[in-house]
Amino acid sequence: GQKLLRTAQREMAYPIAVTIARRGSITGDQWYKASRTVYGPDDPTVKDRLLLILAIGCALMGSALLLLPTLIRALPGRYAYYLPEPLQALRHRPHPDTLPTPDFTVARTVPPLPYPTPMPTLTFTPSPMPSPLPTPTPSPTPSPTPSPTPTPPPRFILTRFRHEYQRWNNCGPATLAMGLSYFGRPETQREIASVLRPDPEDKNVSPEEMAGYVHSLGLGARVAVGGTLERLKRLVRAGFPVIVETWYVRDARDQLGHYRLIIGYDDAMGTFITQDSLDGPSLHVRYDQLDELWRVFNRVYLVLYHPLREGEVLAILGEDGDETRMLERALATAYEEIAAPPSTCVAYARCEDWVTFGWFNVGTNLNALGRFEDAAAAYDHARRLGLHHRMLWYQFGPYEAYYATGRYEDVIALANATLATASNLEESYYWRGMARLAQGDIKGARRDFEKALRYHPGWSPAQDGLAKVEEMEKR
């Protein structure tokens, strides 16, 4: 093919180009006439040569069209994002909108998870008491008048923030950079991402990873779950910016995780004031909308503070300062929300997702409490109802619960389904590697741990997994 192309260029294309240069630009209809001017009207090879050039051009165009999806998929997402929508559609291999449902023969072996039984209300029946003897009436003593509880202001906002619009998939580092700017820190999202997210295509940075980064700067950070709207207000009023992890819904298929920085509230408008790395500075989000989207992540939040003020943070958290009590309360809330779903929703693409996300939260809290059998059963419920295909980009409780209960095929099936939607998720590679290692597939486990480290160099869980593989290979 290359030889024919060079021959065509030498013997035909160049003379025609000379003719075009002499006569000026010509149309496609004049091409044949131009060639006949070069070779003469009776040259029998002209038509054959034209057909050859046409065939080569069509072959090259056809090859380019066949390779186009492969070439577009090879583009990093941060560049492909700017392609026209029809070309972006070529990047995505077909996959189900929901994660695979559990194997019912396996799931049925797990005890069903009952709703919590409410405690009965205790009533006391007074028993007859003997008539008391008369006693002298004591003189009244003055008691101190309690000071009135100050009424919270109906509107409050923290200032001194530097807003940053996020780079590709970088809402975690961008939101953290905005939160740190409140304390006068100069770190930008680029600097933070170089530590927390070395792969620019990584989909997720966890609240725990962000808290670790904050601690490395000498500041305080605390991750908690089961938050409430009132607690967010109290923290902000006390001078503590709060990062919340929420769902971001474009439509039923296009949903993903997104961090928002809470910097204030306005009761008259019924909104929180946020710094949003995607949608802009000082953005108002309705209370009910934020709570519904926040709920998808078990209402997790990250409080930023100066270490000298940690006692004030703990005072606001109250009993939730104890992790076990916090998880038990969040678990009870998840149960209650499953038992009484609202008739309408304000933020979800499908209102049925209320119960699906509720069961997922039940599993998340049980998993954190170490009740892996019950957690696996709760995750089974969520999967049967239809769990969004991006859920395990951000939350990994199902992997841990199924692994802890020996359901390695479920771990592998979920990892395969998740990696079909995005190929650079180190957590999915890690858990699939752990499941394969438990099944004795040492080579498969090595490949998975190495891929996890390729996307997140130096990540300690994958390094530990690879060390286990090497230990088994020596036996």
PLM features: residue spans?
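Noncatalytic regulatory segments and standalone regulatory/sensor domains
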Residues: 267-365, 374
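Register position in tetratricopeptide repeats
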Residues: 368, 404, 438, 468-472
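Cysteine-nucleophile protease catalytic domains, especially the papain-like/related folds used
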Residues: 148-226, 298-320, 324, 328, ...
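Active-site-adjacent substructure of cysteine-protease-like catalytic cores
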Residues: 224-275, 425
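Alpha-helical adaptor scaffolds
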Residues: 364-372, 380-434
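Ser/Thr-rich, Proline-interspersed low-complexity disordered segments
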Residues: 81-155, 344, 474-475
